From Swiss-Prot:
Protein name (database record): Isochorismatase domain-containing protein 2
Any single GO CC term annotated in Swiss-Prot or TrEMBL for this entry: mitochondrion
Family indicated by similarity: Belongs to the isochorismatase family.
Species, as recorded: Homo sapiens
GO biological process, one term: protein destabilization
Phosphoserine modifications at: 7, 202
SUPFAM superfamilies according to UniProt: Isochorismatase-like hydrolases
A UniProt-annotated Pfam family: Isochorismatase
Statement: the UniProt record of this protein carries the keyword rRNA processing: no
Subcellular localization(s) per the UniProt record: Cytoplasm; Nucleus
């Protein structure tokens, strides 16, 4: 089978990895739509486990910002602590060990900080980045909107969780489809995205 052209942004389980960025206790009451984005990220994690997509988890200065929130469901994953506003330096060794890697699916916070800088670092490495828009947020909706627009300008793909999940599973005859169907039976919770995409002045037009 011919390889997908990079410009199409196709995602396949065998050449993808899921990044979970800094969804920690101290952010719980400050990030817009925090419960909703964690819920969607948890859904992405469950799908990644079903499809054997590798998962990488970071925590920003956990001594001060606390551990990853339990509802993300990261049991069995070893979080990597960092202070840099990018996941890439902490995950450099993991990335280098995966020559088949083409696509990174990115969830977490904050959009204008660690998500943006992680995206730029990954693009610099020649990887495709799929920002899971319903699993990324910021304290400020303005920062969130501008960061999404900035990442798109730089060459990242903006995708919804369900769109990526269905790309990964690929076919209703997939042996894991029935389990995945249970996860997406209910639409992803509203995380304020519709208002960001509406209006004549939207930066995402």
């Amino acid at each position: 089978m011919a390889a997908a052209r990079p410009s199409l942004g196709r995602v396949l389980p065998g050449s993808s990895v899921l990044f979970l960025c800094d969804m920690q206790e101290k952010f719980r009451h400050n990030i817009a739509y925090f419960p909703q984005i964690v819920s969607v990220a948890a859904r992405m994690l469950k799908v990644a486990r079903l499809l054997e997509v590798p998962v990488m988890l970071t925590e920003q200065y956990p001594q001060g910002l606390g551990p990853t929130v339990p509802e993300l469901g990261t049991e069995g994953l070893r979080p990597l602590a960092k202070t840099c506003f990018s996941m890439v330096p902490a995950l450099q060794q993991e990335l280098d060990s995966r020559p088949q890697l083409r696509s990174v699916l990115l969830c977490g916070i904050e959009a204008q900080a660690c998500i943006l800088n992680t995206t730029l670092d990954l693009l610099d490495r020649g990887l495709q980045v799929h920002v899971v828009v319903d699993a990324c947020s910021s304290r400020s909706q303005v920062d969130r909107l501008v960061a999404l627009a900035r990442m798109r300008q730089s060459g990242a793909f903006l995708s919804t969780s369900e769109g990526l999940i269905l790309q990964l599973v690929g076919d209703a005859v997939h042996p894991q489809f029935k389990e995945i169907q249970k996860l997406i039976k209910e639409p992803a919770p509203d995380s304020g995205l519709l208002g960001l995409f509406q209006g004549q002045n939207s930066l995402l037009h």
